[in-house]
Design a protein with these regions (language model features):
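Bacterial N-terminal signal peptides that target proteins for export
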Residues: 1-8
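Acidic, contiguous segments within the catalytic cores of piggyBac-derived transposases
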Residues: 11
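N-terminal signal peptide c-region/cleavage motif recognized by signal peptidases
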Residues: 17-20
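Acidic/polar surface patches and capping/hinge elements
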Residues: 23-415
């Protein structure tokens, strides 16, 4: 996972980050994303607090800016603030305080970035008023979305027959996932998909055969483009699209802050439901199923004891597809924000390929579909699992869009 290089890159970015006034929301959200990626790549497992860091940052920025330019309902029930306060100061302070809370080891770099951001705000009274608003928003956000102490945190237990060997590496899914408080969804179970298809069904045989043919390392049926897609989509970065949207004429800081907050809340709620379902169903990956195709009770599946996937198999259960879940959630949120065919296209980078260029898609749904397809080309998921994940993502996003950060009625004469 290129842990060392990601951590060095994040440290360098911290040292250089000085959010510009016009891009305060994007700059701090991009910084939050880099810190989150470095924490995820670290050999030390993320804490429950850290998996909420990026969303808390987005929520704190939104609440701070929305307190000054009151356009939407407050998620954290914060009162309206001084309308003359600096929105840049409020956003920078909110982000800084949240990131410092979650990544104390980065204090010196964060302090430098924050000092540079605040130094660019000339109006001292507006700056200090914004600082106070940002501090209040961060304090509230840091308490939101955490672990519910009333819910158990059950460690994963490998399932096998007594006396039979099983791989000793535990899945990289921490016990706290099921105990986190969702942002909007009532509980992860509200989005739980139906069980995987029956192993004796025609659907199982069809999807088994698809991944066997297209997802193997030595596949002769997968095209060179499909191979590139599998590698490129292992880790994606939507920030080029977010920046393009945020920079559009007429966009306001509070609109941009809300966009990031809704995006992150939908991402989190979809991801949590997906992880809980994975642990519940414990379904086998293609590398296991295809090598044991004679053990599934289906005469239409033929075993291949030498089959290996194109991509490394993630160290946790298969169903439902995680990439498919979050990509569908993102596409649903962004379609609601700017339409399915945004001006300038859907611009995505890859975090899996060093120095990758930005790729443009015409539509959000086309990008999300390619993410889903890429997991089959990579040999790590089945089509029915992709579809289950897509459904989770869309439902989670729709719930967040319908229930959180709703526009307030505008008073007559207001702009």
């Amino acid at each position: 996972m290129r842990k060392s290089s990601r951590m060095l890159a994040a440290a360098a970015a911290l040292a250089l980050a000085a959010p510009a006034s016009a891009d305060t929301v994007c700059e701090w959200m991009e910084l939050a994303g880099r810190l989150g990626a470095a924490a995820q790549a670290s050999p030390t497992p993320q804490t429950a607090d850290q998996v909420r860091a990026t969303t808390r940052t987005a929520l704190a920025i939104f609440e701070a800016v929305n307190s000054i330019d009151r356009r939407y309902q407050s998620y954290l029930n914060l009162p309206a603030g001084d309308s003359a306060a600096s929105q840049d100061a409020a956003a920078a302070t909110a982000a800084y305080q949240v990131l410092l809370h979650h990544y104390p080891a980065q204090r010196s770099q964060l302090e430098e970035s924050y000092a540079l951001a605040m130094a660019g705000i000339a109006d001292a009274r507006a700056r200090e008023a914004g600082r106070a608003i940002g501090e209040a928003a961060a304090a509230a956000a840091n308490q939101a979305g955490g672990v519910d102490p009333a819910l158990p945190q059950t460690p994963y237990r490998p399932r096998t027959r007594p006396g039979e060997w099983i791989g000793a590496s535990l899945p990289s899914l921490e016990p706290y996932w099921g105990a986190l408080r969702p942002w909007v969804v009532q509980s992860p179970d509200a989005l739980r998909p139906p069980p995987p298809v029956a192993l004796t069904s025609q659907r199982w045989a069809r999807d088994y055969e698809e991944v066997r043919r297209l997802g193997g390392r030595t596949s002769t049926e997968r095209t060179p483009h499909q191979t590139l897609v599998a590698r490129y989509r292992q880790a994606f970065d939507t920030m080029p699209s977010m920046r393009l949207i945020a920079d559009a004429p007429g966009r306001t800081p509070v609109q941009n802050a809300r966009m990031f907050a809704v995006y992150q809340m939908a991402f989190d709620d979809a991801a949590q439901a997906m992880v809980v379902a994975k642990l519940q169903y414990n379904f086998w990956r293609p590398i296991t199923a295809i090598r044991n195709g004679d053990a599934d009770g289906n005469d239409a599946t033929q075993p291949d004891p030498n089959w290996v996937p194109l991509l490394p198999t993630p160290n946790f259960s298969e169903y439902p597809c995680g990439h498919c879940t979050v990509a569908a959630a993102i596409a649903e949120v962004m379609t609601a924000e700017v339409g399915n065919r945004p001006r300038g296209g859907v611009r995505i980078m890859s975090l899996a390929i060093p120095n990758s260029v930005v790729q443009a898609f015409p539509r959000w749904d086309a990008w999300a579909q390619e993410v889903s397809d890429s997991r089959i080309y990579g040999g790590v998921h089945y089509r029915f699992s992709n579809e289950a994940g897509e459904q989770i993502g869309r439902r989670a996003a729709r719930m967040v869009l319908d229930r959180a950060l709703q526009p307030l009625p505008r008073r007559r004469g207001s702009r």
